[in-house]
């Protein structure tokens, strides 16, 4: 089987694509799989790191506002449609699968025009713009939440699959757990809290953790904290203001991004983060308690909906973004 997977932007779009690719390879070792992305997103790091080839095209998210900048992006995205078509003619895929990001518009549309079967995965309970716009052109839409099915209009076929995840549950022995903690720079003496605002980082969460460090509230636990690559220098500057060196915070390991997330999530006792569909699914699969701070101002407030799925089974506590402080989080 020859497969193209379109995924771009954030880890929440890219990791489901990698999970699908890994499963295809597991079932059919001779499969040929390539990814299509942009030159700007996290796919440039995560896809090659997972062992897959990445082809890049021009693609941009467009706003409703009429502006010179938007017109330029529209022109580049039209170019991307042609670039995607060229890749498909050369690679000759049996199927094209989109797992999120504005890259899906050009790739799914190109595949449809060439008569190539298509699939699109929607992670959230409230379908995004890409799914709504591409519903007629997509042969099968896969959804993570059953509630999403009636919200997708004019689709040929909608199937409830759940979210494809890379992270699996492991029952580590004491020695293995201690090895992982030691590599992180922590130990087995205190509980471990994982803090991550997703691949883009979360400013409000980062500010709360800086407050905890500044006031030395972290006496009863250790922490591994992923700030997000774009916010690492901001956090470093905030800590510098309090004469705290980012690499010398007792009991807290601070990183831009965590690449061995499967190991870290398995050894962590509690997870703190946003409530994207991928994050919520991974936490549920691992059976870990969590504190979730849903991202506000997203379409249909879908992160709050995601978080409530875990809250309703007493697996998570929700703190609203506007109510978040270091003191409240520490409590």
Write out the residue ranges for each language-model feature.
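Active-site-proximal region of nucleotide-activated glycan assembly enzymes
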Residues: 2, 42, 53, 112-178, ...
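Conserved nucleotide-sugar phosphate-binding/catalytic loop shared by glycosyltransferases and other
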Residues: 3-8, 27-76, 81, 161, ...
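Short amphipathic alpha-helix
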Residues: 13-24
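Donor-nucleotide binding loops and adjacent catalytic segments primarily
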Residues: 41, 46, 175-270, 304-307, ...
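Structural loop-to-beta junction motif characteristic of Rossmann-like glycosyltransferase folds
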Residues: 52, 116-117, 269-270, 287-295, ...
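Glycosyltransferases and closely related glycan-assembly transferases
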Residues: 83-96, 104-119, 132-140
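Acidic donor-binding loop of glycosyltransferase active sites
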Residues: 93-95, 258, 262-281, 288
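Short alpha-helix at the nucleotide-sugar/activated-sugar donor binding site of glycosyltransferases
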Residues: 112, 135, 265, 283-284, ...
């Amino acid at each position: 089987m020859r497969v193209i997977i379109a995924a771009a932007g954030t880890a929440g779009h890219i990791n489901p694509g990698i999970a699908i690719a890994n499963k295809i390879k597991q079932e059919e070792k001779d499969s040929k799989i390539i990814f299509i992305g942009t030159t700007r997103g996290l796919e440039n790091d995560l896809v090659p790191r997972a062992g897959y080839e990445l082809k890049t095209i021009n693609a941009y998210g467009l706003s409703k506002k009429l502006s010179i900048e938007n017109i330029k992006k529209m022109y580049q995205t039209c170019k991307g449609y042609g670039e995607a078509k060229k890749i498909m003619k050369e690679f000759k895929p049996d199927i094209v699968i989109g797992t999120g990001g504005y890259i899906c518009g050009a790739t799914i549309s190109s595949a449809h025009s060439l008569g190539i079967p298509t699939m699109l995965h929607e992670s959230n309970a409230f379908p995004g713009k890409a799914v709504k716009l591409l519903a007629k052109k997509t042969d099968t839409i896969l959804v993570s939440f059953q509630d999403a099915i009636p919200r997708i209009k004019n689709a040929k076929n909608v199937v409830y699959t759940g979210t494809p995840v890379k992270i699996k549950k492991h029952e580590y022995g004491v020695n293995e757990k201690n090895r992982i903690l030691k590599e992180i720079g922590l130990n087995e003496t205190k509980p471990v809290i994982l803090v991550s605002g997703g691949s883009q980082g979360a400013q409000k969460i980062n500010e709360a953790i800086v407050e905890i460090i500044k006031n030395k509230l972290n006496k009863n636990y250790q922490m591994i904290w992923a700030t997000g690559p774009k916010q690492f220098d901001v956090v470093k500057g905030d800590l510098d203001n309090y004469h705290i060196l980012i690499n010398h915070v007792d009991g807290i390991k601070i990183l831009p991004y965590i690449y061995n997330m499967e190991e870290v999530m398995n050894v962590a006792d509690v997870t703190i983060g946003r409530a994207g569909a991928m994050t919520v699914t991974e936490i549920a699969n691992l059976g870990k308690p969590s504190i979730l701070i849903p991202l506000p101002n997203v379409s249909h407030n879908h992160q709050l909906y995601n978080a409530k799925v875990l809250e309703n089974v007493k697996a998570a506590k929700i703190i609203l973004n506007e109510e978040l402080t270091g003191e409240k989080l520490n409590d």
